[in-house]
Amino acid sequence: MEPPEGAGTGEIVKEAEVPQAALGVPAQGTGDNGHTPVEEEVGGIPVPAPGLLQVTERRQPLSSVSSLEVHFDLLDLTELTDMSDQELAEVFADSDDENLNTESPAGLHPLPRAGYLRSPSWTRTRAEQSHEKQPLGDPERQATVLDTFLTVERPQED
């Protein structure tokens, strides 16, 4: 009698078993309270075994962050920020004043700010509008303004 297909007598199926300790996974029942084994410690930061986490690049933090002060690009965030909130406006103004004081040359004093921030898009919009502005005395502009007012008026009721 022949064996069923796919199960030859000379074939031995063997799976390669990798010890769990090599993968960084503790064996069950070893009394290791579920903590991941630490392979090394670099700069005070524990690095887990390579089977769980592979660190390809290591870099230093860009800057330290305190609980009260976070540095980010203010110009991008001012469009999304409600500047009518007085406390928030003061925080932005304070951080902007600090930047001006550190960047100004000795002997020169920065001009006081009015308490608002400008973003590049606001500046661009104002610059574009100033190119498009026509003097108020221009008859063409006055006709446009009058047409606008005439179309907005309510019809008189009889």
Curated annotation (Swiss-Prot):
Residues 1-50, 93-158 are annotated as: Disordered. GO terms for biological process: regulation of signal transduction. The modification Phosphoserine is found at residues 95, 119. Residues 125-141 have a biased composition (Basic and acidic residues). InterPro entries: Dysbindin. Signal peptide: none annotated. The keyword Plastid does not apply. Keywords: Phosphoprotein. One of its GO terms (cellular component) is cytoplasm. Belongs to the dysbindin family. This is Dysbindin domain-containing protein 1. It comes from Homo sapiens (Human).
